[in-house]
Amino acid sequence: MGVCTEERPVMHWQQSARFLGPGAREKSPTPPVAHQGSNQCGSAAGANNNHPLFRACSSSSCPDICDHSTKPFGNAYGTESFRSYETADRATFEDSAAKFSISRSRTDCTEVSDETTSGISFKTEPFGPPSSPESTSDSKITRNLDDCSGCGRQIQDRFYLSAVEKRWHASCLQCYACRQPLERESSCYSRDGNIYCKNDYYSFFGTRRCSRCLASISSNELVMRARNLVFHVNCFCCTVCHTPLTKGDQYGIIDALIYCRTHYSIAREGDTASSSMSATYPYSAQFGSPHNDSSSPHSDPSRSIVPTGIFVPASHVINGLPQPARQKGRPRKRKPKDIEAFTANIDLNTEYVDFGRGSHLSSSSRTKRMRTSFKHHQLRTMKSYFAINHNPDAKDLKQLSQKTGLPKRVLQVWFQNARAKWRRMMMKQDGSGLLEKGEGALDLDSISVHSPTSFILGGPNSTPPLNLD
C-alpha cells in the first residue's frame, strides 16, 4: 500500500510551525525526513516511485526541504498549496524531524492507518428532547382536550363551547335533567359531573332563604311565593297583625313586606300624591318606625308620626297635625277607598297580588296627562307652516317631524289645538268687530288682525304648554 493514496482535501494550518508536530506528519502526504533518516526517506520514495509527488531527488545532496514539497496538488485538492517549510525555524524543524524519524520505523512511514480517517465516530443527536413515558402521556392528554366531553368525538367545528374546563360541541352541551340545549344560555351549573340549567339546579340543589325569617328553605319543604320572594308557610302572614295568609287571600307587598288587605289599604291611603314617592319614602315610616324623625330632611310633611303598631286613617287625623296634600288640577272621579287601595297605580316597590287566582289586578286609575313644552325654533317652524296650511297631511307631518324633532302625534295635536283656537277667534271677531287699537300682536290664544295668519308673528314666549291626550 502506498502512502496517502486517498485523494481528499486535508486541513492545513496557516502557521508553518503547526506542521512540526508528529500529528501533522501523519496527515501530510510527504512526511519530512532528517539527515539521519535519509535511507528511510529513500525507501519511502522508492516505495512510491509511480506517484508524481514522491519521485526521487536528482541532486546528490538531498536538502532538508525537497522542492516537490512546495508544488501544488492536483485539481482534486483545489488551488490551495502547502506553504514551504523554509519559512519555519530551521533549528526547530530539524529537532522535531529527528525525533520523528527515531520514533517511527520504515513500516510506520509507508503504512497508512485508517485511524486518521475513520478513528473518529460522529454522534448524531436526535432533534428535540428525548422521549419519555411522561412526555408520551402529555401528548395523549393534549389530544384528548380536542375531544367533546359530551359525545367523546373529536371537535372539528369552527366554534365550540367551553364549560367546566371542558370542550363541548354546540349541540352536546345540554341540561342533565330537562335535556334543554344550553348553547344560548349565559350560564350553566355543574354538580357531580353533570350539567344543569339554572332552574333545575336551584330546584334540585338550591337552598333559598325565607324573606322574613332569613332561615334556609330545604328543597322538599312547602313554600309560599310572591313575585320573586319565597316564604315559609308559617312566615307568610301580615307584618302588622300577623294574620296568616292562605291561598286565595288578598294581600299587598310594600318593600318586601307582606300586608293583609286592611293594613295595605291604610298604608296606601296616606300617599296619594304620586306613585314615585313610595320608592323614596317607604311606607313602613308611616307606621311609626323608630328610625323616623320629624326633623329628618327626608320626612314627608303629609305623614303623621304615630306609635308603632297603631294605624290611624288619614281622615281621623286630629287638628293641628299636617293633613295629606291635595292633588292639584281638576278633580277626578274617585273609586271607593277599599277598591282604590288595590287598584291604585303602584310603582316597582309596591304591588297588589291576588294569590292563587292566576291574574293580578292592574291599575285602573287614570294617570295625569303628559304636558309638552316646545322650544322657540320648534314653535317658529310650526307657526310658519300653520300660516300656509292649517291641516297638514301625513307627509307634511313627517317633514315637520324631521325638522323639529317632535313626534308626529305631538305635531298633530298642536295643529288640532291651533285650528280650534283660530276658529274661536274668528267667531269672536265676527261678534265683537275689530279689536281695539294698541292691543299688540297676540299668540295662538288671541288674534290682533283679521288675517288668520297674522297671529303667527306673535311672541313665542307667551305660548303656554299644550296638553296631549
UniProtKB/Swiss-Prot annotation:
Domain LIM zinc-binding: 148-200, 210-263
GO MF assignments: DNA-binding transcription factor activity, RNA polymerase II-specific; metal ion binding; RNA polymerase II transcription regulatory region sequence-specific DNA binding
Keywords for this protein: Developmental protein, DNA-binding, Homeobox, LIM domain, Metal-binding, Nucleus, Repeat, Zinc
Tissues with expression: Expressed in PNS and CNS.
Any one GO cellular component localisation term in the record: nucleus
Predominant location: nucleus
Ranges of the DNA-binding region feature: 367-426
Matching InterPro entries: HD (IPR001356), Homeobox_CS (IPR017970), Homeodomain-like_sf (IPR009057), LIM_Homeobox_TF (IPR050453), Znf_LIM (IPR001781)
Region: Disordered, residue numbers: 21-44, 111-141
Any single biological process term in GO: positive regulation of gene expression
Keyword Metal-binding assigned: yes
Localization (cell): Nucleus
Protein task: Required for the normal development of the wing and halter imaginal disks.
Protein name listed in UniProt: Protein apterous
Native species: Drosophila melanogaster
